[in-house]
Amino acid sequence: GYVQPIGEKAIPGQVINAKSTANFGVGAFLLAACEYVRYLEAPQTADRAYWCKLAYQMAYPVLSNMAKGELQKNMQLEVSPTWDGRNKKVAYMETFGRLMAGIAPWLTLPDDDTEEGKMRKELREMALKSYANAVDPQSPDYLLWRQEGQTLVDGAYVAESFLRAYDQLWKPLDETTKKRYIEEFQQLRRIDPPYTNWLLFSSTIESFLAKAGASFDEYRVN
């Protein structure tokens, strides 16, 4: 895609469509905009089908690998030259937690025989296996629960996914996996959150523990 040079200005009245080749904004925006224009111009394309397909395309590579314990093996990481030196494996928890928090409400919908229903069912089944691997110390995809302060943030996204789809994503887990999650969430209290939005991450985890009937820290919720 075209990347706008620093200092270059947009042309007044410039219009973007699927055939645009003129300079417009930065490359990432141009590519995204053109893709969306193609979608808008496609005949008889439903919004829901389009967005569900995108959600599936984003989720499948993560969950299909993690369900087999192969996410960390197959997901290559690249870091900035200014990387702060923290353990790079935080990226795997970030990937899984934020993905699941995002698609959890979608996965709460009941199964059906539509194309969307089949996608949801497939992702949910892979997600349940991925959840188990995430807290199994013997799994290659055991996440970085015991190191780095960042795990409080991304652990909260995992907890949020359970809150958003409690019956579909938490209840089906086996008792060993549930016990492991409760232990991992509780040990995150070792991290003292700064007085920022990190307070919300702590409260999300404690709120989930309360819902699951486990011991929770009321102070961190209030």
Regions found by a protein language model. Name each.
Residues 13-20, 83-93, 145-149, 193:
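Short, solvent-exposed segments of well-ordered alpha helices
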Residues 41, 63-74, 111, 139, ...:
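Residue-level signal for secondary-structure boundary elements
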